[in-house]
Amino acid sequence: MDIPQNITEFFMLGLSQNSEVQRVLFVVFLLIYVVTVCGNMLIVVTITSSPTLASPVYFFLANLSFIDTFYSSSMAPKLIADSLYEGRTISYECCMAQLFGAHFLGGVEIILLTVMAYDRYVAICKPLHNTTIMTRHLCAMLVGVAWLGGFLHSLVQLLLVLWLPFCGPNVINHFACDLYPLLEVACTNTYVIGLLVVANSGLICLLNFLMLAASYIVILYSLRSHSADGRCKALSTCGAHFIVVALFFVPCIFTYVHPFSTLPIDKNMALFYGILTPMLNPLIYTLRNEEVKNAMRKLFTW
């Protein structure tokens, strides 16, 4: 059966209709995007070029920074362009591509953050077996699982939307093509699809967050037997990771766990996990990490 598609493009309301505010947003988000790309790529180059940063934790951090660069690029350029121009339209094909790309990279990041928590658990709770457990082969395999999981998650999200008929209106109350705003303009009952979105996005975020929280409870419990210096170093590393986890997971859970509806605050939540968190990750991970900062100094003085 053919799916009626009278709409060839969508008009996105963005963050503001005020031209003065839009110009301010253009400057702000352009700066954020430049800082995001430069900061994350600096971490990737620093880790890949420094022999002292060859441990699993930095291997995963380099992959996270690589993902954040492209994850931010799935939303930020369009948001920046729409803040400058009045015609905030996006074709149906580009909308589907943006939806797939954002959920693909977001899914990879969710799984990778969980993998990084497992790496911290092994390093702190099983220090004598760390090198035998977290081998290069296992680390590469875990990253591969993250990419595969993100692809499957995004594929499901895309398939949920592709069969929907869009015959008008075509106004999306968002700055990016996302599931709930698209479901609102579909010309059919989308209640069941909304429940599937909650299952595929909301529950995945929630379950991964609960696993992360459980791993940190175990880590904190095991730190009682460590020395004061060991506790400080472990808490510094784990604290940075947990801040990143909270900044990414909490807005995602809020957006996708509630019953199908688009709330006004959803756009602000999307800004957190899609635009701001990729920028903050390099700062959070390197602010108190002397090894990374020393490697960066050597990189610039080489």
From Swiss-Prot:
Q: Which PANTHER family match?
A: OLFACTORY RECEPTOR (PTHR48002)
Q: Which InterPro entries match?
A: GPCR_Rhodpsn, GPCR_Rhodpsn_7TM, Olfact_rcpt, Olfactory_Receptors
What are the protein's UniProt keywords? Cell membrane, Disulfide bond, G-protein coupled receptor, Glycoprotein, Membrane, Olfaction, Receptor, Sensory transduction, Transducer, Transmembrane, Transmembrane helix
Q: What does this protein do?
A: Odorant receptor.
- Gene Ontology molecular function: G protein-coupled receptor activity; olfactory receptor activity
User: Where in the cell is the protein located?
Assistant: Cell membrane
Record flagged with keyword Membrane: yes
TM region positions: 24-47, 56-77, 99-118, 138-156, 194-217, 234-256, 268-287
Cytoplasmic side stretches: 48-55, 119-137, 218-233, 288-302
The segments annotated as topological domain Extracellular are 1-23, 78-98, 157-193, 257-267
Quote the gene name from the UniProt entry: OR4C3
The glycosylation sites are N6
* Primary location class: membrane
- Among its keywords, does the record have Cell inner membrane? no
Question: Under what name is this protein listed?
Answer: Olfactory receptor 4C3
Q: Which GO terms describe its cellular component?
A: plasma membrane
Q: Which family does it belong to?
A: Belongs to the G-protein coupled receptor 1 family.
| Bilayer topology | Multi-pass membrane protein
Q: Which cysteines are joined by disulfide bonds?
A: C95-C187
One Pfam family name from the record? 7tm_4
